[in-house]
From Swiss-Prot:
It comes from Mycobacterium leprae (strain TN). Transmembrane segments: none annotated. GO terms for molecular function: methyltransferase activity. S-adenosyl-L-methionine binds at D132, D161, L162. GO terms for biological process: methylation. It comes from the Bacteria. It is an enzyme of class 2 (transferase). This is Putative S-adenosyl-L-methionine-dependent methyltransferase ML2640. Keywords: Methyltransferase, S-adenosyl-L-methionine, Transferase. Exhibits S-adenosyl-L-methionine-dependent methyltransferase activity. Its EC number is 2.1.1.-. Signal peptide: none annotated.
Length: 310
């Protein structure tokens, strides 16, 4: 269970979810029709020691193996892989558009194993700030450096928990609140309580010059019964495949029904925001699959919100 002051490294708790996401990016990169290319994802996954389960997600035959056990669970695995690719592509495009607009200051909140500071083609003079737990940041930078990988921008680490007083740490790293900024909150909100989500956006607003922008992945809502069913199904699949399920992701998420609707909150607090549902974006790029549970429940899926500071 989560606590208000829990911490982690790349092999424990919330840290392992970054490995899961990187595994999905690695699997996508190996596809002939890949939406995104992340040449460092597989390296970051295989060096974590986070467990055989996440490394198994790199196996191109994994969906077929799961399907032999549980067809609906296999549809979920395929959906999650495609979702991560679509999400990554959406936010890559967001960053690229910010660059075209002349923004040169970027902040990735809870950056995990995000490799954009290394794999995107940044213009000279671009600074990318990454905020996350100290051990998570250290694992990524050390692993990539040991393999001769260097950032393509001025990458600056801000090793602090976002539940703490992080703005002073960001400023100390060189952040300029008078400059336009492009913020990214991807794969973050579900790991924050509702009040912490509001507090995070309030802090971001106070640091954002006019013309700044933000992109956010929202936190979908799932009922207790659905979560319990998914936990049982994936535990059964893991057992059948011989994998130890060291971390139950559902136990890491805050399921707050009173969480603010992100686009609405931003529109009320000095931003002009729009939202794109994840299923609509997946259909737009040809990655929505049949057989996804709860396909008709819009609240069961995230939104991708983008906003400009007024």
């Amino acid at each position: 269970m989560r606590t208000h002051d829990d911490t982690w490294d790349i092999k424990t708790s919330v840290g392992t979810t970054a490995v899961m996401v990187a595994a999905a990016r690695a699997a996508e990169t190996d596809r002939p029709d890949a939406l995104i290319r992340d040449p460092y994802a597989k390296l970051l996954v295989t060096n974590t020691g986070a467990g055989a389960l996440w490394e198994a997600m790199l196996d191109p035959s994994m969906v077929a193996k799961v399907e032999a056990i549980d067809a609906e669970a296999a549809a979920m695995v395929e959906h999650m892989r495609s979702y991560q690719a679509v999400r990554t592509n959406f936010f890559d495009t967001y960053f690229n558009n910010a660059v075209i607009d002349g923004i040169r200051q970027f902040v990735i909140l809870a950056s995990g194993l995000d490799s954009r500071a290394y794999r995107l083609d940044w213009p000279t003079g671009t600074t990318v700030y990454e905020i996350d737990q100290p051990k998570v940041l250290a694992y990524k930078s050390t692993t990539l450096a040991e393999h001769g990988v260097t950032p393509t921008a001025d990458r600056r680490e801000v090793p602090i928990d976002l539940r703490q007083d992080w703005p002073p740490a960001l400023r100390s790293a060189g952040f300029d609140p008078s400059a336009r900024t492009a913020w990214l909150a991807e794969g973050l909100l579900m790991y924050l309580p509702a009040t912490a989500q509001d507090g995070l956006f309030t802090e971001i607003g106070g640091l954002s010059a006019v013309g700044s922008r933000i992109a956010v992945e929202t936190s979908p809502l799932h009922g207790d019964e659905w979560r319990e069913q998914m936990q049982l199904r994936f535990r059964r699949v893991s057992d059948a495949l011989g994998f130890e399920q060291a971390v139950d992701v559902q136990e890491l998420i805050y399921h707050d029904e009173n969480r603010a609707v992100v686009a609405d909150w931003l529109n009320r607090h000095g931003w002009r925001a729009t939202a794109q549902s994840a299923p609509d974006e997946m259909r737009r790029v040809g990655r929505w699959g049949d057989g996804v549970p709860m396909a008709d429940d819009k609240d069961a899926f995230a939104e991708f919100v983008t906003a400009h500071r007024l």
